[in-house]
Amino acid sequence: MSVLTNPSLLLLRNSEELKGKSILVVNFVQDGFLNELKTLNPQSKITAFSYNHANGEFAKNISGINVEVNHTINAGEYDLVILYYPKSKPELLMALDNIRAVISKEAELLVVGENKSGVKSIEKQLANKTAFSNKIDSAKHCVLYSFSEITLNSTFDISTYHKEFMVNVSDIEFTAVSIPGVFNHGGLDAGTKMLLENAPNIKHGNVLDFGCGAGLIATFLGLKNPALTFTCSDVSALAAYATTQTLKLNNVNGEAVLSDGLNSIAGKFDLIISNPPFHTGIATDYTVAESFLNNAKQHLTKTGKLTIVANSFLKYPPILEAQFDSYQTGFKNNKFAVYSS
């Protein structure tokens, strides 16, 4: 059995609450909770839903669990929903609206999270949407809440959460589409802006936009050089959806794919370009970016190039030195640096 996280331990010490015929677990983590939940409910239908492809791949190895990784939770008439509180408040509010469109009228909603995640705001966030709320338990710096007699939504349409914004860099202007939970939600960040200003001017070929967010990098390069073809990868189904919308809106030739790091990426590229992520959930996590840098070379053509932007304090140059014959620092200030192989 996998080690249990503190939110999962809190859930399991209230195992009498974890009973249902059709159970939905949203934003689950990579631990042993789903196994334990199946043991408690051997005859029940259990669906594990995540926006995160890596979590979905983890859960696929658990017997008796239906796994869904998507940008939208599908209808299921669930009578018990267990929600792990996410790091993004806009993502939470969108997920709650989605949940209220897929549950039965008798459903109970359990919400668990670490204190530092902001979970203590959940009662206010569900005000006027449930008749009963109860703080069931708190321990290990976590809190567990229960909600019942929930006001249902007749439908859920993710397009109502689209947020469009303008990007204008180096005489290239376009409209981007984002949704809650996506990096670049609502605007162009300073690091990506610097990357675009210093991106190589490749005229044709295949480009991988790694950790694509809302698809800003691919769209910028595609509008600058329309002969390019893009593969845009992200671990987030929300990001893949947003990127698809942005590419389509701007008639850029590319596709969005779900991948845990480079695991699902096939073929070789003339350019790999990225503002690599260094957070997992609410925690700092360098493993994804470091694994990406250690393995990017095998996905490049013989003359292919890697270009990234990173916070200046991150220790990426030693990895670049080890993996490539040479690399250049294209631009650097006290906040960011652009590196190219």
What are these regions (language model features)?
Residues 2-63, 188-274:
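Conserved SAM/SAH cofactor-binding pocket of Class I
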Residues 4, 140-206:
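SAM-dependent Rossmann-like transferase core, predominantly class I methyltransferases
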Residues 69-71, 257-260, 310:
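Short loop/edge segments at beta-strand edges and connector loops
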Residues 70-76, 263-267:
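Short amphipathic alpha-helix with an adjacent loop that forms part of the alpha/beta core around
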Residues 78-84, 269-277, 307:
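Short SAM/SAH-binding signature in class I
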Residues 88, 279:
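Active-site beta-alpha loop architecture of Rossmann-like, nucleotide-cofactor-dependent enzymes
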Residues 91-169:
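N-terminal auxiliary segments of SAM/dcSAM-dependent transferases
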Residues 109-131, 135-138, 283-341:
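Conserved Class I SAM-dependent methyltransferase catalytic core
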